């Protein structure tokens, strides 16, 4: 990077910090009766919950999903997930992970970077605070870096609870939806939060983030595509009617959809959801202390880690028996996932070859639609974390339809390529590793990593300093 570029970056960083410092002069959230985003502010009234929440920091390891499955680099060619995709860690690391991922780039001022403000939406209770203070448009408008100094606390208390209520102050949970767009989504499926049962509310607060969503309008605001329902077919029809695409695929030129993490939607269709076994039953069980005190364990994690408090509350099988059942289902889903990936990856490269051979937009349109639908269905299944446990039958069925759609695309491509004089199989480059797949796409990973490291060293410390100054006035 040139000296000139570094100097310009330093000036931009200064401007970004000054913008953040100007925000510090605002009256504190507590004084205005707004959301307090600090998780430790609630330790005194909820000590057990807070201490167990802190234990989500124990999931230290970062698992590189692209290194584990390089096919995904090709499937997301031209989109941020081809740069970097790690498996989720504990809530404690939500801010660290979104700051560090290559997907958010290395912005040097409030107006640069590849992502919108919406990418903070599931990462911090500061989001609820900023929406409270500025309104939804005031939160969503602009680039991700615009309010970086405002988003300072990882996922915690004020994301799921009405921390301003008297009930919460007196030790009760008082669950709440803290994002207005989530309230609208539940109204769209005729399940307004205030009319939901206790069990439904326990699932709905998790659904604020563990769902499919997209960015819409000039501010790139978050919206759930539930207007026609929450099933894979219904959301596909919604997106098609809207003419929406997250991006255009770099190889096939297909108008693609990127499923986020529709865990709530797949859970609803599975055996647990249909029997009202909700998220907290398995991931945040009630536990008893030595003194007899019962509280909800906020160390969100694997149910097998607390088997007696989770699975054993309903199941009569032993831990080993249930683990074997889950392991078998996971292997079945993985096998179908890889089968779908092989077909969709091939379809992308074959579509790319068809374009190079002179195919027209009219000839390609139905093929690209098949590819779009195939990958949407694959992504819907694999992005639903824990789907092999929540709804394995749903995952297998949806992945089966992904294979079918990909086969439809490839059948049409064989015929089209033949009309262009191409009768030999289309060659697929070396994509055996993450690095090889990224190289095949011409991605400059060295540059991206350098930009990210510069951002982490020059911008993030100033964000943290500005946030600490603001919170010192609470």
From Swiss-Prot:
Q: In which pathway does it act?
A: Nitrogen metabolism; nitrate reduction (assimilation)
Q: Which GO terms describe its cellular component?
A: outer membrane-bounded periplasmic space
Biological process annotations from GO = anaerobic electron transport chain; nitrate assimilation
Q: What compartments host this protein?
A: Periplasm
Q: Which residues bind Ca(2+)?
A: 212-213, 258, 260
Q: What is the UniProt remark on how the cofactor binds and its stoichiometry?
A: Binds 1 Ca(2+) ion per monomer. Binds 5 heme c groups covalently per monomer.
Q: Which residues does heme c 5 bind?
A: 272, 311, 314-315
* Catalysed reactions listed for this entry: 6 Fe(III)-[cytochrome c] + NH4(+) + 2 H2O = 6 Fe(II)-[cytochrome c] + nitrite + 8 H(+)
> Where does the UniProt annotation place the signal sequence?
1-29
Sorted keywords for this record are: Calcium, Electron transport, Heme, Iron, Metal-binding, Oxidoreductase, Periplasm, Signal, Transport
Group of enzyme by EC:
oxidoreductase
Q: Does the keyword Lipid metabolism apply?
A: no
Q: Which InterPro entries match?
A: Cyt_c552 (IPR003321), Cyt_c_NO2Rdtase_formate-dep (IPR017570), Multihaem_cyt_sf (IPR036280)
Q: Which residues bind heme?
A: 119, 122-123
Where along this sequence does the record place binding of heme c 3?
91, 206, 209-210
Q: Where along this sequence does the record place binding of heme c 2?
A: 157, 160-161, 298
Query: Sorted alphabetically, which HAMAP family does this protein's record hold?
Result: Cytochrom_C552
Q: Which family does it belong to?
A: Belongs to the cytochrome c-552 family.
As for what it does, the entry says: Catalyzes the reduction of nitrite to ammonia, consuming six electrons in the process.
Protein name stated in the entry: Cytochrome c-552
């Amino acid at each position: 990077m040139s000296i000139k570029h570094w100097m310009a970056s330093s000036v931009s960083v200064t401007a970004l910090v000054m913008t953040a410092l100007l925000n510090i002069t605002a009256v504190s959230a507590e004084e205005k009766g707004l959301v307090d985003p600090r998780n430790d502010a609630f330790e005194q009234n909820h000590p057990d919950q807070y201490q167990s929440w802190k234990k989500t920091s124990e999931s230290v390891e970062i698992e590189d999903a692209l290194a584990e499955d390089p096919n995904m680099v090709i499937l997301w060619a031209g989109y941020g997930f081809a740069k970097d995709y790690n498996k989720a860690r504990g809530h404690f690391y939500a801010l660290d992970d979104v700051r560090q991922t290559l997907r958010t780039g290395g912005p040097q001022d409030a107006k640069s970077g590849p992502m919108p403000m919406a990418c903070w939406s599931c990462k911090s209770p500061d989001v609820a605070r900023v929406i409270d203070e500025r309104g939804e448009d005031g939160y969503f408008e602009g680039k991700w870096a615009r309010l970086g100094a405002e988003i300072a606390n990882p996922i915690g208390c004020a994301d799921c609870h009405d921390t301003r209520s008297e009930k919460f102050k007196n030790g009760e949970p008082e669950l709440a939806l803290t994002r207005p767009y989530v309230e609208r989504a539940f109204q769209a499926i005729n399940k307004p939060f205030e009319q939901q049962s206790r069990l439904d509310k326990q699932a709905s607060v998790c659904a604020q983030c563990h769902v499919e969503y997209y960015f819409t309008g000039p501010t790139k605001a978050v919206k759930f595509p539930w207007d026609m329902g929450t099933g894979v077919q219904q959301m596909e029809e919604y997106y098609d009617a809207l003419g929406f695409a997250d991006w255009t695929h770099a190889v096939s030129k297909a108008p693609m959809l990127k499923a986020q993490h529709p865990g709530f939607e797949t859970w609803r269709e599975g055996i647990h959801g249909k029997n009202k076994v909700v998220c907290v039953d398995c991931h945040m069980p009630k536990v008893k202390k030595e003194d007899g005190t019962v509280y909800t364990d906020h160390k969100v994690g694997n149910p097998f880690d607390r088997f007696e408090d989770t699975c054993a509350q309903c199941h009569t099988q032993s831990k080993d028996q249930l683990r074997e059942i889950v392991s078998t289902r996971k292997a079945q889903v993985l096998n179908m996932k890889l089968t779908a990936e092989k077909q969709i990856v091939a379809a992308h490269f074959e579509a790319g070859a068809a374009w190079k051979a002179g195919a027209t937009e009219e000839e390609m349109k139905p093929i690209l639609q098949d590819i779009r639908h195939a990958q949407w269905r694959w992504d819907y299944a694999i992005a639903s974390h824990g789907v092999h446990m929540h709804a394995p039958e749903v995952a297998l069925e949806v992945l089966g339809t992904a294979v079918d759609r990909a086969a439809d695309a490839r059948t049409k491509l064989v015929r089209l390529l033949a009309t262009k004089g191409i009768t030999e199989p289309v060659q697929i480059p070396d994509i055996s590793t993450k690095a090889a797949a990224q190289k095949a796409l011409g991605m400059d990973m060295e540059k991206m990593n350098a930009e990210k490291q510069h951002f982490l060293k020059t911008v993030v410390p100033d964000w943290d300093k500005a946030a600490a100054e603001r919170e010192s006035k609470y």
